[in-house]
Every structure is written in C-alpha cells, then in structure tokens.
Amino acid sequence: MITRDKLKFLREHFDKNITVINPTTKKPKAVYQGNHYADGRKKYEWFNGWTDEELCSAEYLGVFHREDKRKDKPICAAVDFDDIDYVAHDWNIKLPPSMSVVKETKSGKKVNQRIYKVNGSGFPKIDYGGDSKDSGKLVETLQSGVSVIHAPDRTFTMIPPSQVDPKELEKNLNLICFFTEVQ
C-alpha cells in the first residue's frame, strides 16, 4: 500500500495511467468493462480508471508506458536492469537522474528500473544479453507495456520522471553493458 503523498506524486506525473497489478502474473489486473467475446463470454481487460482509494489499498501498482494502450501515445519508458549478478544495476549512476524503482535484492536495495518521460525524440530500443535474466540478459528498455513500481519487495523514488536525449541514453546504456561485461 502507498501513502496519499506518493499517490499524489504519481497522479501528477502519470495521471490516469496508474494501474493495480495482479501479484500472480505481474501484469495489470484485468477488469470486466462491459465488453464480450463473440461467443458471449465476458471480456476482462486492462483498466486505468482506478479510484484513489483502490490504488492506495493495492499491494502492487504499475504505470502504463502508453496512454490507453495506443502505440502513438507513449508517456514513459523504462530502463530495466536484469543482470542476475546485479553488476549492471550498480552502473545506473551513468544514467540521467529520473524516477527509479528500487527493489530489495539479496545484495541489498538496487535500482531495478529507471523511468523516463517520452518526448517527441523517441526512446532507444536496447535488449542486451540473453533472452532472459537467467540466460544472461543485462539491460533492456521497456516501452509498450507496464512497469511494476510498487510491491512488497520494491518501491519508487519521488524524483519526477525526466525527459532524456535518446542518443545520449543509448550511449550510456552501451557503456553500462560494456562496464558490466569487463567487471
């Protein structure tokens, strides 16, 4: 659960694009919104109309990267650190300051994601390492889904998400991957 101050911060920077997360799937909680499949079954869909009370009482929260799931309306993107040894996580200091998701790990508290506002310049696509955390993935950028920002094992900093030069960010992410590989 989050405080009213933290929710006010989220509303200021993400407006209605805050969602309750299903703790089992780590995806937005699906809600029946009156729509049906062709065979008549109820259709459960992602939802962004949560009340402040529902958001404050939720154990898991996330922010959508795109407004109303529209590809042409990005609002934020995330740098996601996936290094199983947490070496890449420590190189987050090379990134421009912005809202961060801090996770409790076996190595202590680590920045797990850095979230940036997306402007007209775009956001770099980075997927460095293996196919998954277990197969050697170090860093990736997330732009089309949701970032889990609050859960029992993580919380977020109340630093406003900043806009970033995509070329500069890409250079810094490549540098982080290089430093992680040689460390």
Please provide the spans of the model-predicted regions.
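Signature for HUH/AEP ssDNA processing cores
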Residues: 1-110, 119
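DNA replication initiation modules
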Residues: 67-85, 108, 116-183
